[in-house]
């Protein structure tokens, strides 16, 4: 029988006494010496515990854990990440540029511009950014941050 560890208040206190708060699931796992598969991290938005796959996706997307003033830690499940991304585009859309126009708008090279997926919030790597540029596809400025499509969401659409 596998033991599942819920992050108790005592664990948080130990974490804070040691040093800074972990920002990734893997850092939290290492800090607590609990395997990722045994972590129970609630979603900040729906309160559901993330599955093992969602915990791994969270780090793959380069998202950061959410810490409260009371030292509780939360993540964001895949469903809420999609919902949050759509809400932000609907409520805070600012501008669309195509392909390399983003470099003119930002006055820096594409590799230095932080861009997340407009659907799943994954941080785009350089290949994904260049792919969007080479096909002259859109980048959207939302809440002062750039959005585009990652390779996974591009295949689904």
Swiss-Prot record:
<comment type="function">
    <text>Plays a major role in the induction and maintenance of cellular transformation. E6 associates with host UBE3A/E6-AP ubiquitin-protein ligase and modulates its activity. Protects host keratinocytes from apoptosis by mediating the degradation of host BAK1. May also inhibit host immune response.</text>
</comment>
<keyword id="KW-0244">Early protein</keyword>
<keyword id="KW-0238">DNA-binding</keyword>
<dbReference type="GO" id="GO:0042025">
    <property type="term" value="C:host cell nucleus"/>
</dbReference>
<feature type="zinc finger region">
    <location>
        <begin position="117"/>
        <end position="153"/>
    </location>
</feature>
<keyword id="KW-0945">Host-virus interaction</keyword>
<comment type="subunit">
    <text>Forms homodimers. Interacts with ubiquitin-protein ligase UBE3A/E6-AP; this interaction stimulates UBE3A ubiquitin activity. Interacts with host BAK1.</text>
</comment>
<dbReference type="InterPro" id="IPR001334">
    <property type="entry name" value="E6"/>
</dbReference>
<dbReference type="GO" id="GO:0006351">
    <property type="term" value="P:DNA-templated transcription"/>
</dbReference>
<dbReference type="GO" id="GO:0052170">
    <property type="term" value="P:symbiont-mediated suppression of host innate immune response"/>
</dbReference>
<dbReference type="GO" id="GO:0003677">
    <property type="term" value="F:DNA binding"/>
</dbReference>
<keyword id="KW-1048">Host nucleus</keyword>
<dbReference type="Pfam" id="PF00518">
    <property type="entry name" value="E6"/>
</dbReference>
<keyword id="KW-0804">Transcription</keyword>
<keyword id="KW-0862">Zinc</keyword>
<comment type="similarity">
    <text>Belongs to the papillomaviridae E6 protein family.</text>
</comment>
<dbReference type="GO" id="GO:0030430">
    <property type="term" value="C:host cell cytoplasm"/>
</dbReference>
<keyword id="KW-1119">Modulation of host cell apoptosis by virus</keyword>
<dbReference type="GO" id="GO:0039502">
    <property type="term" value="P:symbiont-mediated suppression of host type I interferon-mediated signaling pathway"/>
</dbReference>
<dbReference type="InterPro" id="IPR038575">
    <property type="entry name" value="E6_sf"/>
</dbReference>
<keyword id="KW-1035">Host cytoplasm</keyword>
<keyword id="KW-0010">Activator</keyword>
<keyword id="KW-0805">Transcription regulation</keyword>
<keyword id="KW-0899">Viral immunoevasion</keyword>
<dbReference type="GO" id="GO:0052150">
    <property type="term" value="P:symbiont-mediated perturbation of host apoptosis"/>
</dbReference>
<dbReference type="GO" id="GO:0039648">
    <property type="term" value="P:symbiont-mediated perturbation of host ubiquitin-like protein modification"/>
</dbReference>
<feature type="zinc finger region">
    <location>
        <begin position="43"/>
        <end position="80"/>
    </location>
</feature>
<dbReference type="GO" id="GO:0008270">
    <property type="term" value="F:zinc ion binding"/>
</dbReference>
<keyword id="KW-1090">Inhibition of host innate immune response by virus</keyword>
<keyword id="KW-0863">Zinc-finger</keyword>
<keyword id="KW-0479">Metal-binding</keyword>
<protein>
    <recommendedName>
        <fullName>Protein E6</fullName>
    </recommendedName>
</protein>
<dbReference type="GO" id="GO:0006355">
    <property type="term" value="P:regulation of DNA-templated transcription"/>
</dbReference>
